[in-house]
């Protein structure tokens, strides 16, 4: 059978950070992991409630961070995600983050990553929509991006 594609795969930051839907959702998980690897991805962040299971995961640095569908990540999860992506990039390992559809939870984490690099929430969400064609699903997810921004801003003020 011919490989179709991995749904919603796109780079937010070229060859550094991407988002996609659940590997194995439409194809065999191994085919999707091979596809990601062929696109240069070397680190995988899974936001689904269940861990991925495949021997091909050994090709990737893997972080499982379960978040209930249609909800937002907590502060510690966002901080862990940002640190993981930064660490992977320092090791020259482009990362992909996924949830089930690759939109809500994935978009929230991607927007928070943009905020961590100095973007205000409206700009982060605009960039997310430009690059990926999607925004966020729930008010709770938008609020998580806003709260992350204000928490970062408060922490920055305390250091001055």
Language-model-derived ranges and their functions:
Residues 1-96, 110-160:
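Cys-dependent protein tyrosine phosphatase-like superfamily
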Residues 102:
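Conserved G/P- and acidic residue-centered "switch" motifs that form tight phosphate/ATP-binding loops
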Residues 106:
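Ser/Thr-glycine-rich phosphate-binding loops at phosphate-binding pockets of nucleotides
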